[in-house]
Amino acid sequence: ILRATGTTLSLLTAERTALNFLCHLSGIATVTHEWVQRLEGTNTKVRDTRKTTPGLRRLEKQAVHAGGGTNHRHGLFDAVLIKNNHITAAGSVRAALEKTRNAGVPVEIEVRTREELDEALQNGATHLLLDNLTPAEAREWVTYIRSVKQGVTIELSGGINLQSARAYAESGADFLSSGSITHSAVAVDINFGLTME
């Protein structure tokens, strides 16, 4: 993976910290690659979330990318994600979308019911997050969305794991998002061997 040179003291001092980073980030890249392989042959891509370790978001997202996954947003500055609490606070899907009309960044909205879905589509939503559906429900919703409006980006999330990923991908969604690829990835076992020259 890597070759480092330096004094014995500096190498041994940095060893554990460096290994911790490499093990953790390699675990993320590895599990992401497993998702990518599971989705092979579909048009669906795996996407990370903002559920990252404080201070390590950039590196963890880079590890997702290295594993073949795609990055969602890095923060509140590069995309808006309207979740159920935002809809409740705004009063309706329409009102929440209206508040973000001139955001200058992509706007994605989570819809929980068919009524919210229709309201989102009627009010110009182009990026939809469908959360906590079964694979059968996901297929039904994706088919409906594609029949009503072309060009909508559809993301599925909530309760999706590596074992169920393929069934969700076969719904025709554009993305599956999973916080588990960053927050629950098992570290890869990597060691450090010192040689003296």
Where are these regions (language model features)?
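Cys/His-rich Zn2+-binding cysteine-cluster or related metal-binding knuckle/ribbon modules and their
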Residues: L162
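Active-site loop ensemble at the mouth of alpha/beta enzyme cores that anchors a bound cofactor
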Residues: N191-E197
